[in-house]
Amino acid sequence: MTNIRKTHPLLKIINSSFVDLPAPSSLSSWWNFGSLLGVCLGVQILTGLFLAMHYTSDTATAFNSVTHICRDVNYGWLLRYLHANGASMFFICLYLHVGRGLYYGSYTYSETWNIGILLLFAVMATAFMGYVLPWGQMSFWGATVITNLLSAIPYIGTELVQWIWGGFSVYKATLTRFFAFHFLLPFIVAALVMVHLLFLHETGSNNPTGIPSDPDMIPFHPYYTIKDILGFLVMLTALATLVLFSPDLLGDPDNYIPANPLITPPHIKPEWYFFFAYAILRSIPNKLGGVLALVMSILILAIVPILHMSKQRSMMFRPLSQCLFWLLVAVLFTLTWIGGQPVEHPYIIIGQTASVLYFLIILFLMPMTSMVENYLLKW
């Protein structure tokens, strides 16, 4: 008798995606982050759902409802901090996942890569709107500053900002719609994840060598399921440690002050995982230029496949490109640090230098290095 998992209309989809899926035998731990992102999304949707049962999206009560969740709801503090720090884990896994794709040339699967970029934008939008919901000082001023950037768009900018705000400033209508979108977007993200996997399973996974692995495949289960479970345990342990020992480590103390439109915080900044993009935005002394640089800092990923000049797919056997890749990582760490600092000397010039380097490495140095490597290998 044929196994039910191979014949049942629903089970056979799951079977071909997670059980009998042929996978390259050489996948390293860098391939764990896709499944870790799935776990992060699940944790965020579950904790978010329970938080939404107690949260009120009204300017008069939003801040107090979050306090109520932490103080009066059974394990409400745990839900709240799992959700807040879960977002940080989500972005750590996201950036490592994208970095893995860049290093090993996974971007040559253009459909999977482009859906991934779309997912990155969707998750960033979700996280930004979630940061507004507690209605603390940084929530209010962060929302005001970031949405106001759209006013830099010629002709329609001002009307667009007022349309998003639902009035002439960030107030009740803004908070209500941000809550609605923050609730809705994760489900759209989940749908996009399925499309992402659909395209991935059309081509099969890449592997560290970048060499086609068709002759050497192994079943996903049990080899990679057990490997993924180890990844889950490591990540959930890290998340639990963060939540139980230092839940406010990655947050902003200003967000424990209720939103006040009359008092501006000394340093308005987003959550730490947006610091690199925020630093690029601030490094250009022109509003429209800054907004374009901000968008391009993520959108540049879409042209990476076009800039691939190497005859090899992966960077595994390309030491010059490896040096550039790790320089890019160092630049991103520098930008992340600068994004959290005040706008004063020497941070301004460091941020501007790092921003120029970021675009220079991706747009010029990496393709040129690839061509040099091709020449050295007489290809």
Curated annotation (Swiss-Prot):
One of its GO terms (cellular component) is respiratory chain complex III. Its cofactor is heme b. Binds 2 heme b groups non-covalently. GO terms for biological process: mitochondrial electron transport, ubiquinol to cytochrome c. CDD domains: cytochrome_b_C (cd00290), Cytochrome_b_N (cd00284). It comes from the Eukaryota. The keyword Cytoplasm does not apply. One of its GO terms (molecular function) is ubiquinol-cytochrome-c reductase activity. Its main location: mitochondrion. Belongs to the cytochrome b family. This is Cytochrome b. It comes from Dermanura phaeotis (Pygmy fruit-eating bat). The lineage of its organism: Eukaryota, Metazoa, Chordata, Craniata, Vertebrata.
